[in-house]
From Swiss-Prot:
Organism: Plasmodium berghei (strain Anka)
Chain's gene name: ACT2
Positions of post-translational Tele-methylhistidine modification: 73
Cell compartment(s), UniProt: Cytoplasm; Cytoplasm, Cytoskeleton
Designated name of the protein: Actin-2
Job of this protein: Actin is a highly conserved protein that polymerizes to produce filaments that form cross-linked networks in the cytoplasm. Polymerizes into longer and more stable actin filaments compared to ACT1/actin-1. Has ATPase activity. ATP hydrolysis leads to the formation of a stable intermediate ADP-inorganic phosphate (Pi) actin, which is followed by the release of Pi. ATP hydrolysis affects filament stability; ADP-bound actin depolymerizes much faster than ATP- or ADP-Pi-bound actin.
Taxonomic lineage from the root: Eukaryota, Sar, Alveolata, Apicomplexa, Aconoidasida
Amino acid sequence: MPEESIALVVDNGSGMVKSGLAGDDAPKCVFPSIIGIPKMPNIMVGMEQKECYVGDEAQNKRGILTLKYPIEHGIVTNWDDMEKIWRHTFFNELRVSPEEHPVLLTEAPLNPKTNREKMTQIMFESFDVPAMYVSIQAILSLYASGRTTGIVLDSGDGVTHTVPIYEGYVLPHAINRTDMAGRDLTYYMMKLFTERGYTFTTTAEREIVRDIKEKLCYIALDYDEELKKSEERTEEVEEMYELPDGNLITVGSERFRCPEALFNPSLIGRECPGLHITAYQSIMKCDIDIRKELYNNIVLSGGTTMYNYIGERLTNEMTSLAPPSMKIKVIAPPERKYSVWIGGSILSSLSTFQKMWITKEEYDESGPSIVHRKCF
């Protein structure tokens, strides 16, 4: 592996793939982790129609496609589709040849072991990379925030997890993972719209709802108070949204009722604890001496933490759970949507990291299981 070859950093999330070159301060390309298959046969001869579309192209042609997500809850469910996404990332988006660059991939904590092994296998056997590494998403977010101690609350499209890290050491016994995140909120939003009389059912319409959710939703500081306000003074909560066909729809109390499920998952019929409780439980599983520092460094990361007022609400909730004199500090970096990728970019450009890569020789010698020995 030549010294000067720059690493490629690929953060393959359940909803979006963020990729770029190590050392950059933002990902070069971000596109949805979507594969689109045409619903109808092609009758126009000479039209360059593909068997499948990836990412933005699938998003743009979604009206005639059936959309699939190859990654669900952080776990790859369809490896053929995943390979298409990686192929698209390397050759069409980054325009690099993977056999010339080491590749850093990311994954959620407490993922099935087979998931990493298969990732490693595809990278070495299908893309012939010289070296690769798999890192846990939350650790990278902490790197990006410039800390070595803190509890990272990372919520993306498929997985929400809280990971306590002390002086750079991850405390694996205290990691909490919930398979409830952005995509579940999108489905909940679709259900709330049905109650209002708007029906969104197809996979293409689900993407419209995701856009409404991202643009208009916010977290209520006091949910009951906000509900009362939305019933008494409706106009204060309502916003208009223009659909792709030009029609306008009104979005009202759904704006805060949808993301409320993060703090109260029973709203969508889930038995898991809310964000604030998982963070609290993670801290309580740690040694009593380090809890104070964790309470003081709660770092948010991931696209599902982008809602307005989430920092204030989390601070309030944590304050009511923590001991009375405890100082709570929630850090919500403005670039947190991409902080996992930024952390990966920092990590893979460190000179001390260069000896951590899994090389092609090591892979040929030990097979895919090498990934458990070399990557945390």
